[in-house]
Amino acid sequence: ALERAGYAGRPRAQIEPARYEGFLEAHIEQGDYLESSGLRVGIVTSIVAIWQYRIVFEGAQNHAGTTRMAVRKDAGLALVRLAAALDQRFPEVAGERTVWTTGRITLDPGAPSIIPGRAEMLFQFRDVDPDRLARLERALEELVAEADAAGPCRCRLEALSRSVPKLMDGRFQDALEQAAERHAPGAHMRMPSAAGHDAQILAQRVPAGMLFVPSIGGISHHWSENTADADIALGCQVMATAAATILDG
């Protein structure tokens, strides 16, 4: 990617922490916790880790009409069974805010009259607790191993990425909470972020804090995503007051 963009070999810009007091970020919640609680501001305590995987089933492509059920190696069916097993097993190890998602399923060749010889799913889960993340991964590995051993299709798991949960700076959280109480008394809460954000990256170099404003209907990553103008204005007020408090020391 760097080569295509013409940046290969160039030194990367680095933040000089000594030059900055820290980093503040405002964002829509992208969920419904604030709205369902009747609150207007969320002070982010931590940002979730996202662990992503590819799960691949290898079966045998064949005719959908002439291949007897007893001898089929239907990769699509094997995938669906694993997806159902994940949805049964994960609640046993999940926390209150753990989430998991099958984001994409691909069947090859993807024709209505052909038994899929290969099936692939992209799967992820999210949490802020490193120990729970490890337990979720073990559960996933066990289910994939069970599916592979049960046959008739082969199943393998590929880890794609594992981000690290990040705590927001305590002083910044306090400043945001005090500002929220000033501008929206009693209408705020501390909460983790279930989505990744810039603050998660910047927090590796400088103190970071983050606030949320409500998402209407808890909708995000969709054309209907929206936030009330009054809540956006309130978020700006809280952000400015918190920044002034932090800079005043």
Regions found by a protein language model. Give the residues of each.
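Short amphipathic alpha-helices in soluble, non-transmembrane regions
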Residues: 135-145
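Alpha-helix N-cap and loop-to-helix initiation/capping positions
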Residues: 71-74, 135, 171, 227-231
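Predominant activation on well-ordered alpha-helical scaffold segments within soluble catalytic domains
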Residues: 3, 52-54, 76-87, 141, ...
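Glycine/charged-rich beta-loop-alpha catalytic/anionic-binding loops adjacent to active sites
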Residues: 58-64, 183, 219-223
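Zn-dependent metallopeptidase/amidohydrolase metal-coordination segment
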Residues: 188-238
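A short beta-alpha structural unit
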Residues: 101-110, 122-128, 154-173, 193-194, ...
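Midchain, well-structured core segments that form catalytic/ion-binding scaffolds
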Residues: 1-131
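Short secondary-structure junctions
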Residues: 90-99, 147-154, 182-187
